[in-house]
């Protein structure tokens, strides 16, 4: 239950960071990608990523016991780096202006869930999570 709320809180935090970053980016560069990335998409993607992370974290703890947290952290970090290929290789609609700037907006957002997860860890974990025997 605590892990679920950790994932939910991290998802909300990373969604808020994504929305703020998107608004700043669009204001600074005077571009918009509202047809592709909008608030429901950002909230949904961040919540799904962090809730999936919570499930993965719980699974790693159950299967790997004491090493579960460090293994999960490695998997989550590597997964964030690997997911960067998605916005880089995205095929945008032809009517999108400045398609070359789309990855500059979306690549940093791929790291927001993992950053939020690690940032709020002290609120949800006193020590390492060690499942009961």
Place the predicted regions along the sequence by residue.
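Generic alpha-helical transmembrane segments
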Residues: 40-54
């Amino acid at each position: 239950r605590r892990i679920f709320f950790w994932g939910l809180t991290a998802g909300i935090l990373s969604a808020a960071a994504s929305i703020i970053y998107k608004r700043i980016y669009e204001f600074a560069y005077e571009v918009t990608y509202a047809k592709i990335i909008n608030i429901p998409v950002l909230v949904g993607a961040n919540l799904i990523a962090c809730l999936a992370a919570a499930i993965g974290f719980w699974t790693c703890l159950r299967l790997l016991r004491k090493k579960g947290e460090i293994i999960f952290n490695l998997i989550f970090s590597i997964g964030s780096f690997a997911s960067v290929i998605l916005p880089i290789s995205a095929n945008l609609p032809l009517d999108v202006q400045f398609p070359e700037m789309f990855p500059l907006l979306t690549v940093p957002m791929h790291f927001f869930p993992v950053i939020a997860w690690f940032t709020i860890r002290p609120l949800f974990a006193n020590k390492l999570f060690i499942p009961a025997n």
